[in-house]
């Protein structure tokens, strides 16, 4: 019904009709799907929460004399240097050198790669320490200096797995606390934690990846970037509702953007007690309304979206595949759910208010003609199986 070119032309002229994924629900209720599909050009989606599989490539530039850094640290957090001379990759979950981790259980994990990234985006100083074995063309063997984002040539966020389409809701059926990436789970199912923006979440508004694909524009902590691939652990073949929405993790996205253009509010270092360090990140993705079906998918409500409740004391770590039940995001967001006759308090690691703020910011940028859409040049696969890691002996021959 509409093309990307037509929608971008309207955006450039500041004539596009843009709604958030929350606003479009009532809009379609009032107008009807056919009329609304003709009027609405873009629906903005967003999420804000922990995204462990995140990091950034950094180019430090050359010192005088030069060094080929083979081992490096930023504020004592190890960086990967197995690439060119002064390039490195900083991972969000990397711990500070000599962090006791879970030696004194549960560990506090006060500082890691995500915190370093937050400091860089804030413009704060970070200490670089690098070592090398020395070569004829790169003779320096050690370097220690202080840097800020402004000193660096490139700082490019490259995240192999963000924006899970859906995710588990976690409980603990054991008699002792369990510390996880979904937070602290109290014994005997006294609480439940989850992590999704539900009806605002990007891939839940495009369940079969019809508009979100390789090359799609994304808003990454305030910086315009793009999807460069399906994410790692992308597992679209899963149990779905009649409308096509997954009840499991399902799809993921690999995204990239210039960290120099990011806004500090939307990129935060995290400490997860008993688990590790991570990064909370804000992501917004616009969905072009190119036909009625795409619009229909964006009108999904929380009561139509379901998460699988998993026991993280046994079934998750042992990979049994057991699901206790499914609960809707409407129930999860109410603050309590009933599981097997027991009322359980719920809490979210994902911030819906921040996600809504991001969706509104992206809506504003598009409405003002400052954020154009990209037509994907590759499709995110919707039929690839997810493989497990077998434990086996070395094959002969």
Regions found by a protein language model. Give the residues of each.
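Anaerobic metallocofactor- and corrinoid-dependent redox/one-carbon enzyme cores
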Residues: 2-10, 15-397
């Amino acid at each position: 019904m509409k093309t990307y070119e037509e929608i971008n032309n309207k955006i450039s002229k500041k004539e596009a009709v843009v709604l958030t994924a929350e606003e479009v629900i009532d809009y379609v209720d009032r107008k009807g799907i056919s009329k609304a599909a003709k009027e609405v050009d873009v629906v903005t989606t967003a999420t804000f929460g922990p995204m462990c599989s995140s990091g950034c490539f950094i180019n430090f530039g050359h010192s005088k004399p030069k060094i080929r850094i083979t081992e490096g640290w930023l504020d004592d957090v190890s960086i990967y240097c197995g690439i060119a001379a002064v390039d490195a990759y900083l991972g969000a979950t990397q711990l500070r050198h000599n962090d006791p981790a879970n030696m004194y259980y549960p560990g506090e994990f006060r500082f890691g790669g995500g915190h370093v990234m937050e400091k860089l985006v804030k413009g704060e100083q970070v200490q670089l320490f690098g070592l090398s074995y020395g070569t004829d063309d790169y003779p320096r063997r050690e370097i220690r200096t202080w840097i800020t984002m402004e000193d660096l040539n490139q700082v490019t966020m490259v995240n192999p797995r963000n924006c899970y389409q859906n995710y588990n809701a976690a409980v603990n059926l054991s008699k002792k606390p369990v510390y996880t990436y979904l937070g602290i789970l109290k014994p005997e199912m006294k609480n439940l934690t989850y992590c999704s923006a539900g009806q605002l979440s990007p891939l839940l508004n495009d369940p079969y990846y019809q508009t979100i694909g390789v090359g799609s524009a994304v808003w990454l902590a305030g910086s315009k970037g793009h999807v460069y691939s399906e994410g790692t652990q992308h597992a679209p073949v899963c149990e779905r509702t009649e409308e096509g929405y997954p009840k499991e993790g399902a799809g993921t996205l690999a995204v990239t953007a210039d960290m120099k253009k990011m806004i500090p509010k939307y990129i935060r270092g995290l400490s997860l007690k008993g688990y590790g360090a991570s990064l909370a990140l804000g992501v917004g993705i616009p969905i072009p309304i190119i036909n009625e079906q795409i619009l229909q998918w964006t009108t999904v409500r929380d009561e139509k979206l379901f998460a699988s409740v998993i026991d993280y004391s046994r079934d998750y770590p042992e990979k049994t595949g057991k699901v206790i039940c499914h609960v809707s995001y409407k129930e999860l967001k109410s603050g309590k759910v009933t599981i097997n006759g027991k009322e359980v308090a719920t809490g979210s690691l994902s911030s819906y208010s921040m996600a809504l703020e991001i969706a509104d910011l992206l809506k504003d940028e598009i409405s003002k003609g400052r954020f154009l859409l990209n037509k994907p040049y590759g499709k995110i696969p919707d039929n690839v199986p997810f493989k497990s890691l077998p434990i086996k002996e070395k094959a002969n021959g």
